[in-house]
Amino acid sequence: MAESDWDTVTVLRKKGPTAAQAKSKQAILAAQRRGEDVETSKKWAAGQNKQHSITKNTAKLDRETEELHHDRVTLEVGKVIQQGRQSKGLTQKDLATKINEKPQVIADYESGRAIPNNQVLGKIERAIGLKLRGKDIGKPIEKGPRAK
């Protein structure tokens, strides 16, 4: 190596571990044995990413001492959805496809298990043509002139 200068030096290196190998339990334990800093963190609720998250304040719900539950869709609204859907000749799956939701969402709303979401209720209202919110539940939606 007496004749080596920066231009002619050959460096032989082992390739580093791939991302999957670096995350393995074996690699983590080996790094800990060598005394290296190892940072591990879990993704929170990664497999349960939902389109419509519940926006109710859960901390407020925890502090409350009386009724410990979120308001659910009333059975009256569920029946109106069901009747409106059937009058249009739609199945739960057809209605869900029409409003870009999962069939389970429609089933939950019809059975009264769902926590009301104004976006979803608005889409269902437009699809079946019946009001689901306010005091005139079950009445047809009047299509008036739109303001520009």
Curated annotation (Swiss-Prot):
Q: What is the effect of changing T74D?
A: No effect on CALM-binding. No effect
Effect the entry attributes to changing T91A? No effect on CALM-binding
Tell me which domain of life the UniProt entry assigns to the organism this sequence originates from.
Answer: Eukaryota
- Which part of the chain is the HTH cro/C1-type domain? 81-135
Modification Phosphoserine, positions: S4
* PTM annotation (N6-methyllysine): residues: K25
Keywords recorded for this protein, A-Z: Acetylation, Activator, Calmodulin-binding, Cytoplasm, Developmental protein, Differentiation, DNA-binding, Methylation, Nucleus, Phosphoprotein, Transcription, Transcription regulation
In which residue ranges is the amino acid composition biased (Basic and acidic residues)? 33-42
- Extract one GO molecular function annotation from the record: DNA binding
Where is the short sequence motif IQ motif located?
81-88
One Gene Ontology cellular component term attached to this UniProt record is: cytoplasm
Q: State where it is primarily located.
A: cytoplasm
**What's noted about domains in the record?**
The IQ motif, which is involved in calmodulin binding, overlaps with the binding domain for nuclear receptors and transcription factors. Its phosphorylation probably allows a switch between the two activities of the protein.
Task: From the Swiss-Prot or TrEMBL record, give the protein name.
Answer: Endothelial differentiation-related factor 1
Q: Which organism is it from?
A: Homo sapiens
Name of the gene this protein is made from: EDF1
